[in-house]
């Protein structure tokens, strides 16, 4: 599977950090990588301008019939960093990665997040989600 170079680098960094947590995690493949049975939704490119935001939400649904129910990993790749505000905020922490860096986190209900209001400039991000192989979309 070929995806944006920045996302590939982010997934590699994610895998390397998992190994540092515990060496046994080396046996777990990176989602969407070689020898996995996961799939990725189409990449969406989003743009937020001054005064726009995205309210708190989770990326996976709790309704089994919903497409979002099967999402396991969320990825937000920052395509710009020349804006003010517009952080990705979780309950206890917020981030504003530099352009080309990605946030990778579980899609489930334990990770509610929002896009805070952009106060100037344009925030551009590419988002996608990995899900397990046993669904029919």
Which residues make up each language-model segment?
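Fe(II)/2-oxoglutarate oxygenase catalytic core
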Residues: 1-102, 110-137
